[in-house]
Every structure is written in C-alpha cells, then in structure tokens.
C-alpha cells in the first residue's frame, strides 16, 4: 500500500532501551520526538535485540541472522560477500552507505560493511580498508564536526552527514540506502551544550539529547525534495546496561522500532518480533519480490 522503491534510511540508535519511552511507562519525558514519530508510524512494541553489543545489532539488522557463539560475524575475518540486505538492495539498484561518527576500524565495522558493498562515511583517522574491499570511503572532516568525544561525533553531526549524502544520491538520481549508527547515548554521556534541559554526564541527559537530535534530523529531512520518497527505520542497536554474566535478562533486550513515512497507515505491531526480522518486514511493506537467504522473516 506504500511506496515501492523509496530511499531507505535505517538509524541504529546507541543503547536505546524501550523503557526510555513514554509508550513503555517512562514518566521523564525523555523521548518526545520518538514518541511523536511512533504515533505516526508502524510501531513495533514487542521487539527484542539479539545481543548486548553494537556489533550484534549490526549483524542482526544487515545479515538478518541470529547470534552465533563466539565473536559477532562483524568482528570475524573473511566476512566479505555474505548474503545480506545489501545483496537485495543492489539487485534493486540501490547504493548502500554505512555512516558512522567514529573510525569504523573499531570492531572491524568498515571491513564488514565494505565487504558487503556499502560505501563508508566515517572519521577515517588513518586506518585503511583492506585492499580486497573496493567500495568508496568518505572522510568526515574536522570542519564538519561541532562536537566529538571518544566514541565519535555527536548525533547532530552524524545526521548532517546523512542529509549530505542523501542530497548527493538524490542528485545522481539513484535510490539510496543508509545505515546510520549513532554514538551520543553512550558513556561518558557528553553532547553539545544548550540543546536540552538536562545536564551532561548522566544517561537521562544523553537519552534526551539523542531524541532531540533525532527530531531535528527528521525536521531537516522534511525540507528536502527526497523526503517524500524516503522511508525511515529507527531502531536500537541494543539496550542500555544490558550485559550480564550468568543469564539473559529479557527486559534488558526490549527495544523499540518504527517504520516512518512509508505511506502505510500508522499501527502498533504487538506480535513478538526480533531484530533479525526488521528488514524483511520492511521489504514486505514495500511489496518487494526477491530471492532471499535471510533467516529473519516478514512478520506479516
């Protein structure tokens, strides 16, 4: 019922637990923008992350596979040319980007995403890609950064990169896919001054800033000619403070996800849902026909 061949921006928000949202009982008004967008979107309320680290979320969202013992596939050697969402996107003439505000050398992210055919946008502080990877790498220059900590540039800045490359792709008349990884909602919880009414250095302030930056991103995107033909998938990589030594705490794997601006009616999906099902479900809403080796399924 919606747009069939839109641009797609997938935002993976760092450590964005479901219990930060008003919809799940939080009374701190930390996420007014996500709450508003959820009411206008397909909103998945019974979604669980596959792991407790960013690389597990990346693995689930791009490869659509459950977590395997040992290291995440993202971190492993010889992880190029796997069947991924990029395989499907390239079949449909999309150009996929991985946009990250740190140096994607960390956790082998660049070799993983580059090895699946994503062009890379990162801080590029001198850690080259493997010679086997033929995709492009674009540097986020110092003059494009307003605030940065050890993890990367602030969410305001990473979203400006997303808009920059969306503008470039739109001018080239080619549909684009972006995997945007944020970093602000992470210790030490620092972010630009003057944006929100909570102090730096605490989780609640980082969550509220993260939400502020998301709201500004959507507002800025709304002004662009490509907005009307762009679907936004906004999900967490994993929960905050979710790692444990002995058992899996289910509550610490509960994350939100929305599909916004798809042309479909807003609804809440309460069926049990995994991160590995997010992209197959999006493709279902887009009415795509494709041959797949993805393990995740269209929830519908």
Task: Identify the residue ranges that each predicted region occupies.
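Solvent-exposed soluble domains appended to multi-pass membrane proteins
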Residues: 1-300
